Amino acid sequence: MFTKIFRAVIIGAPGSGKGTISELICKNHGCVHISTGDILRQNIIKNTELGKKAKQYIAEGKLVPDAIVTKTMLARITEVGNRSYILDGFPRNIAQAEALAAREQIDAVITLDVPHSVIIDRVKNRWIHAPSGRVYNIGFKNPKVPGKDDVTGEPLMQREDDKPHVVAKRLELYDEVMSPVIAWYEKKGLVATFKGKQTKEIWPMMELFLNDRINA
């Protein structure tokens, strides 16, 4: 458990493992995982107005418009209140980073450096339980029963945006969009970068970093 409030942003390309890393951090340290993608997908499943707007952008491998994401994420942060959290998928541009900085003091920006070729291969093995957003990675985080969610026993599925041609497009867009954001945070001395091909390689280094930060 974190002994003091710890608020971090995690940045990584789609399929880099940032969702899994975020879940591990929160499971081991008692924080809230706030995922832009999960929030948007939940709205798509529920067919809300936000979900209808987001569905087409995600299916085409495009980013959901800035105004929609900013409003949604700041509202969720407000709900979390005075608790530690990991922001996954936000901010994704300088304007969002500035909007976040005006509201919150971020303690660290965690970046995951995973080769794109590894990511494209990895998404072939990623399955989700759509209603909850739980993610399984065959070969690392396997479901107890193949093709079934551990909690509900309901069928798992692959995301529309995990198809190889969509992933390749998203990776190109990620590099273009996120490089300025990482540079912005680097100037503030907040960035910690972790390189590796698999989550199991990155996680031990992550734990050392987190333990150093919370005990500082």
UniProtKB/Swiss-Prot annotation:
It is an enzyme of class 2 (transferase). It is found in: Mitochondrion matrix. GO terms for molecular function: adenylate kinase activity; ATP binding; GTP binding; nucleoside triphosphate adenylate kinase activity. It comes from the Eukaryota. Residues 125-162 are annotated as: LID. It holds the Pfam family ADK_lid. InterPro entries: Adenyl_kin_sub (IPR006259), Adenylat/UMP-CMP_kin (IPR000850), Adenylat_kinase_CS (IPR033690), Adenylate_kinase_lid-dom (IPR007862), ADK_active_lid_dom_sf (IPR036193), AK3/Ak4_mitochondrial (IPR028586), P-loop_NTPase (IPR027417). Disruption phenotype: RNAi-mediated knockdown has no effect on viability. Residues 35-64 are annotated as: NMPbind. Ubiquitously expressed with highest levels expressed in the abdomen, suggesting a function in muscle tissues. GTP binds at residues 15-20, 126, 135-136, 199. GO terms for biological process: ADP biosynthetic process; AMP metabolic process; GTP metabolic process; ITP metabolic process; nucleoside triphosphate biosynthetic process. AMP binds at residues 36, 41, 62-64, 89-92, 96, 159, 170. Its main location: mitochondrion. Transmembrane segments: none annotated. It catalyses: a ribonucleoside 5'-triphosphate + AMP = a ribonucleoside 5'-diphosphate + ADP. Keywords: GTP-binding, Kinase, Mitochondrion, Nucleotide-binding, Phosphoprotein, Transferase. GO terms for cellular component: cytoplasm; mitochondrial matrix; mitochondrion. Its EC number is 2.7.4.10. Consists of three domains, a large central CORE domain and two small peripheral domains, NMPbind and LID, which undergo movements during catalysis. The LID domain closes over the site of phosphoryl transfer upon GTP binding. Assembling and dissambling the active center during each catalytic cycle provides an effective means to prevent GTP hydrolysis. Belongs to the adenylate kinase family. AK3 subfamily. Monomer. Involved in maintaining the homeostasis of cellular nucleotides by catalyzing the interconversion of nucleoside phosphates. Has GTP:AMP phosphotransferase and ITP:AMP phosphotransferase activities. This is GTP:AMP phosphotransferase, mitochondrial. It comes from Drosophila melanogaster (Fruit fly). The lineage of its organism: Eukaryota, Metazoa, Ecdysozoa, Arthropoda, Hexapoda. The gene is Ak3.
